[in-house]
Amino acid sequence: MIRALFAAAKKIVIKIGSNTLAQADGTPDEEFLAECARACAALMRDGKQIVVVSSGAQVAGISALHCLSSPPQGAGLERHESRGVIPGDGASCKQALCAVGQAELISRWRSAFAAHQQCVGQFLCTKEDFTDSDRAAQVRYTLSFLLERRVVPILNENDALCCSDVPSVPADRRVSLSPQKRIGDNDSLSAFVALLWQADLLLLLSDIDGVYDKDPKAHTDAQHVPLVTDVSALVGKTSMGSSNVFGTGGIATKLDAARLVTRAGIPLVLANGRHLDPILSLMRGDARGTLFVPVS
């Protein structure tokens, strides 16, 4: 069924999580980037339009600065023996890493797609780009303009500026605008993009083969769930595996994304991006995932 969906879909959003993009040591996986670019190029040769939602700015920032980030609950970065430190609290450090890492991330994507004579375009989004009608219309127009010219849009949240836990700026030093709220995770961002663009398919690549009835990393008897027709019935009753320090989402955000898009008639596939050639394997029917079917 997943193979048939790929064959029929003309407009596909592919979301790539940090867990998928990062190697075990936290550095971006160049081989995965190359595989993904090759698969997207193949899809485009078949007449499909592809939008990529890519996490990984913080991971790329860590790699670029040759330092280690703080633990998930920590406040700040450890000193690196040759590079010193990035001072500040946890949120400020993450934003600084994202500022450095986003440039590194898009550079690596550009190189990966250039091998297939494909150009990429960068979108750094905020929640208001989807909640404000004028800004949403501009996003949709620019996406369409690029796609008509066979450019691959690569989207991420503007993590260098969007954060909910940094100190507020004094009133006399800020412009009087409504406070910015984060999208918070790229599962949600990819769902927003799929809805705005009216995609035919949303693919979420994670580090596990879809949804299970319990955590497969902790339970050997965990059962894979290949098909979901009622997202609400899964809430609190399923698992995707243990969380990874590189990611911000989890099973809850993926179920939220599935709920949003399936209500709009868009199918969602959750699959493992760590397999060899994950996208092409799904297209051939050689890889398994969880398919969330649209609400009828």
From Swiss-Prot:
HAMAP family: ProB. The keyword Oxidoreductase does not apply. GO terms for biological process: L-proline biosynthetic process. The keyword Oxidoreductase does not apply. Pathway: Amino-acid biosynthesis; L-proline biosynthesis; L-glutamate 5-semialdehyde from L-glutamate: step 1/2. It is found in: Cytoplasm. The gene is proB. This is Glutamate 5-kinase. Transmembrane segments: none annotated. It comes from Treponema pallidum (strain Nichols). Its EC number is 2.7.2.11.
